[in-house]
Each structure stands twice: as C-alpha cells, then as structure tokens.
Amino acid sequence: FCNTSLSIDERVDDFIGRLSLEERVALIGPDPSLGSTCNDHTAGVARLGVPQWMWLVETNTGDNSACYAQDRCASTFPGPMAMGASFNRSSWRLKGSGLGSELRAFNNVGWHRDTRGEVRDLIGLTGFGPNINIARDPRFGRSSELPGEDPTLSGVYATEMVQGMQEV
C-alpha cells in the first residue's frame, strides 16, 4: 500500500487486505482504549506504521488544532452565524478553501499539539462542519455553529464551504 507506482485502487485494496476486521473498525471510529467512545481519535495500526490520528477537527471558526510551533497557528475565521449573515457566497467558499488548505498543511506537517503544547498525534483531513442544522430556537446551545434559520441559506452555505475545502 506504500508503493506509489500502483494506482490508488490497488493501494487501497492492498491496505484493506492487510487489516484484520478489528483494525478496519478501529480506523473508522473512535478508539475506546482512550477511555471514552466519544473521542475524536482512531487507534492506528502500529504493525503497519499507521499512527493514531485525529479524525474530526473543529472547523466552525478555524482548524482547531492549536499551534504546531510558536506563532504558527491556524487562521481564525468568522463563525457560521456571521458568515451566514453576510449572504456572501464567495466568502463562504474562501473560508472553506482556507480551512482545507490548513487541514492539509497540518496533516502534512505530521503532528498536532494539545493545549499544553505537547505533540499529540497526526491531524486528519475531516472536520466537524459545516453544521447545517436549522437555528429555530435561540435556546439551542449550538446556534452559534449554524449559519441561520433559513434552510436554503444553510444549504448554500454548506455547499460553498465544502466545495472550497475540496478544491485544495
């Protein structure tokens, strides 16, 4: 699976063929050995050199990956409610593009630091967002993660942001 002269399909087939059922499951969900089934890390596959990695990264206002070095941190963007209020499709796509570029950069750097500045693990290329639930009740505790209460606005916002993330 590390042979770059093979096609992606061949490499994926080779990799999957080397994994046990337990290892396959461990790569698509949280690692319960970390003390909780509600975490954002895989177990990794040490015998194949596949490290534990952070599979969901907060992307509401930026790549929540702390800093990988002094003064080298992810960009911060306006939150979804502010972005939705702008009604500016190109800014939504640019936010997605920035997030996608930074996720790729953090992934390529090969590590992630926790809030204490210690190297924690690899950062993945998947994110918590965009959240497109409809903000209908101001008491909903996660309304700030939503672009607004209009279903069309939410759908267009999500489409532009995801397409921006995938362009990189």
Enumerate the predicted regions with their spans:
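N-terminal beta-rich core of secreted/periplasmic extracellular enzymes
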Residues: F1-V168
